[in-house]
Structures are given as C-alpha cells and as structure tokens.
C-alpha cells in the first residue's frame, strides 16, 4: 500500500480486497495524538530558508520531502503540537494538509474565507501567510481544551475536538455494506 505524501494524491480502489488492504494500512499507519490547543502553534517556511535551517528553527521531525512538498505544492503551514507519550511531553512540527486547515480554524474558534483562501480572485486579495499564522496562533492560545490530531503520511490531516470519537473505518464500511444489502 502506498503512502500519500502530496495533498492532491488520489488512491483509486477497484475491489473489496483493495479497500480492505487500504483500511488495514490506514489502521496500522495513522496516528491520533491528543494535544492542548493553547500549546499549538502554526509556522511557515520562508522561501529563502533552507530546509535544514527550518527544521532546526521549528524543531521539525519529518522528512525533507514532506517539508518540500508542503512548501511547493501544499499549504506552507506547519503545526507545532504537544502530546504526552508514556508520561513524557513530546513536541512535533509537521506540515498541515489542506484538509486540516478548516479543522484547525475550528479549534481556534475562528473562520472565514480570508483565513483559508489561497488564490487571488477578482476583488479578493490573499492575506499573507505569516499574517494568517499570527492570527491563528493568537486565537489558539486562548483555548485550554484538548484536540485530537490525525497524523497521516508525515502530515497533519485533521485537528478535531477532544470529544471527537475516532471510529474504526472497517466497522463503518461493514455497517454501510450491511445497510445497502438490506
């Protein structure tokens, strides 16, 4: 089964066996972490900054390929989060996928087109990336709740509320199949 590093990669599934293989892969490789919202921070990488310098500055824990893809083809936004593993506080800085931006804004209790817009359109300018990061960081710092963070294929795919129930995909697929057969 393949790792999907790029935000716009699509995996086509043509059979029930391929679906099962994909679900097993997701179950084995997806990681959910719990992180305090007020300890989350958004970083950007400046265009002239070398990847190694960025990794040192931000404390990034992921591959150069994932960083480069996030900068060149993705959001160019990285999330620093804290989690507890075996009683120890661990930190990570990883790329944010497009799919994670809205859920990040939900955790910061902010929203609106100006914050997630990436393309200049007629009559609409794009807010500079660092300004977006500053706004999001100020708002994240206000909330002491915890969030569930989905780490998938070296990127953050979602940041859900602490009450979000993580369900097994296999069980959901089987339930849907059962309903469709009836």
Question: Which role does the model predict for each range below?
Answer:
Residues 2-175:
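Feature for intrinsically disordered/low-complexity regulatory segments and propeptides
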Residues 178-182:
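Charged low-complexity "KEKE/polyampholyte" interaction tracts
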């Amino acid at each position: 089964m393949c790792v999907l590093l790029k935000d716009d990669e699509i995996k086509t599934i043509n059979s029930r066996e391929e679906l099962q293989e994909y679900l097993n892969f997701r179950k084995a490789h997806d990681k959910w972490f719990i992180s305090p919202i007020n300890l989350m921070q958004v970083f950007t990488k400046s265009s002239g900054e070398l990847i190694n310098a960025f990794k040192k500055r931000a404390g990034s824990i992921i591959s150069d390929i994932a960083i480069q893809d996030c900068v060149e083809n993705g959001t160019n936004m990285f999330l620093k989060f804290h989690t507890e593993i075996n009683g120890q506080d661990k930190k990570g800085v990883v790329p944010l996928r497009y799919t994670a931006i809205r859920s990040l804004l939900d955790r910061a209790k902010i929203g609106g087109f100006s914050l997630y817009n990436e393309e200049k359109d007629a009559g609409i300018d794009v807010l500079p990336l660092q300004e977006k990061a500053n706004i999001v960081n100020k708002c994240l710092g206000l909330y002491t709740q915890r969030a569930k963070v989905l780490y998938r294929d070296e990127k953050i795919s979602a940041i859900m509320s602490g009450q979000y129930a993580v369900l097994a995909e296999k069980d959901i697929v089987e339930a849907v199949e059962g309903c469709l057969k009836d």
